[in-house]
Design a protein with these regions (language model features):
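Extended hydrophobic packing segments that form well-structured cores
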Residues: 377-416
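A short, compositionally biased
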Residues: 215-220, 289-291, 388-395
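Long, well-ordered mid-to-C-terminal structural blocks that present hydrophobic/aromatic surfaces
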Residues: 264-319
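A broadly conserved detector of short glycine/acidic/proline-rich loop/turn motifs that flank catalytic sites
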Residues: 117-119, 160, 228, 237, ...
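Dual-mode signal for accessory low-complexity, basic/Gly-rich regions
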Residues: 302-373, 379
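A structural signal for short secondary-structure junctions
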Residues: 269-270, 286-289, 296-297, 321-325, ...
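Short linear motifs in exposed loops
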Residues: 234, 305-306, 409
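Active-site bordering "gate/hinge" segments
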Residues: 2-273, 398, 404-406, 414-416
Length: 416
């Protein structure tokens, strides 16, 4: 048994280690992540309970010469109160100044940094799942517009919290679960490397090479085959495969997601047919994970959505507008992904989508379609919902317009 002085020292050591971890994460966010520029405004978006990382990012951003750091907190407790008591017909209302602020951030060419990882994962348990598909906050249509217009350099990263750790590792004691989650996030983000930036630059170069190979194949559509999955996803003639490194309209290079393990593009929203089974839980912020998701497509539209639980939430979201029930993104991920190698379901869109091939219902990223008439054909919507469809048992084959085929993924590995 430790003496009181030993206990106090252990607490001090733990606090010091946590501070160092948070500071390293903040440096990654403002560096190879968002790539904050001198004189730039930095907008940080977080949930209540993520204050330590916001302060560390502010410190790191100002040290890089930021002009102003703007913090925006979203409190899911307030959302819970709204969902419990507000009239149903008001749940889709978003005050105009929320969107106006985001548009102003875009017009200013600011840097945007946000963090994922639920602080209280079970807070909205018991809420009608359909209501969760109506109240989309903190997501907004304006944020999608700013992102698609490449007006800002931005980055989304994970931030471990004790509540999230207990969700991911319920088999461990709370303190052990928190430590385990931090260790995994550090490894996935390459923060355990002697030079995390150099490690990410090497990985980004690998992903860029994969995207270049895919772009050289002249593919007309993709075919997915696996357990309870037979899906064909058409591509536009101008569909362009993109990897993690991006550039804003102001010429600032950045990495939008850390981690990033994908090559992605925008499909033809009217040429998707067949059925697909999700290989990991579908995650909608604030809602319980949707398990056992199965979606059937006809002529591009999701015409049937079933799940073991929570299907009502996704159905409500897919009814929001014309493009919500169509695909806006197709992304390929292989087993080189550290997220996938961890063998852990993180219940985080950011992490889990980088563990396996995935599709997204809703808005496309227009910059993943070559400039020209095809760009206007990319899907448009007020939502963007990723769900994972890849595993070692799911094959992905590329098919050219002449019917010739090329294997893309076999046993979870790129074979192009």
């Amino acid at each position: 048994m430790m003496t009181p002085s030993q206990q106090a020292q252990a607490i001090t050591n733990d606090a010091g280690q946590l501070t160092q971890r948070v500071e390293r994460l903040a440096q990654l966010a403002v560096g190879i992540g968002a790539n904050v520029q001198p004189g730039q405004i930095v907008a940080i978006g977080l949930d209540a309970g993520q204050e330590p990382i916001s302060r560390a990012v502010a410190e790191a951003a100002y040290a890089r010469g930021a002009k102003f750091v703007d913090l925006s907190y979203f409190d899911p407790h307030v959302k819970r109160s709204r969902l419990r008591h507000a009239p149903r017909e008001t749940l889709g209302f978003v005050p105009p100044w929320i969107g106006e602020r985001i548009l102003a951030i875009g017009e200013a060419g600011a840097a945007r940094i946000s963090f994922q990882g639920p602080v209280e994962p079970h807070l909205l348990d018991g809420i009608d799942p359909e209501l969760l598909g109506i109240d989309m906050l903190p997501r907004t249509r304006e944020a999608i517009a700013v992102t698609n217009g490449q007006q800002t350099n931005w980055c989304i990263l994970p931030f471990p919290t004790p509540g999230w750790a207990e969700l991911v590792h319920p088999e461990l004691e709370p303190d052990d679960a928190y430590e385990r989650l931090w260790q995994q996030v550090e490894w996935i983000l390459r923060l355990n490397e002697p030079d995390p930036v150099a490690a990410w630059e090497a990985r980004l170069e690998q992903l860029a090479g994969i995207a270049a190979k895919l772009n050289g194949l002249g593919l007309d559509h993709l075919r997915y085959n696996g357990p309870d999955t037979e899906l064909t996803v058409g591509l536009l003639p101008g569909s362009t495969w993109i990897s993690g490194a991006m550039e804003s309209i102001h010429g600032v290079r950045f990495t939008a997601n850390l981690p990033t393990e994908e090559a992605f593009t925008a499909p033809d929203p009217r040429r998707v047919d067949g059925f697909v089974t999700a290989t990991k839980p579908l995650l909608i912020p604030g809602a319980a994970p949707i398990e056992g998701l199965k979606v059937r497509f006809e002529a591009g539209r999701a015409v049937q959505i079933d799940a073991d639980n929570g299907a009502e939430t996704l159905r409500a979201m897919c009814a929001k507008d014309e493009g919500a029930a169509r695909l806006g993104e197709v992304a390929l991920v292989d087993r080189e992904s550290r997220v996938g190698q961890s063998g852990t379901a993180f219940y985080s869109i950011l992490l889990d989508e980088n563990a396996a091939c995935h599709l997204a219902l809703g808005s496309a990223y227009p910059f993943s379609v070559a400039d020209g008439p095809d760009r206007a054909r990319a899907n448009q919507s007020s939502i963007h919902i990723d769900f994972m469809v890849g595993s070692d048992r799911v094959t992905v084959t590329g098919v050219r317009a002449d019917g010739s085929e090329v294997a893309l993924l076999r046993d979870g590995e790129f074979v192009v």
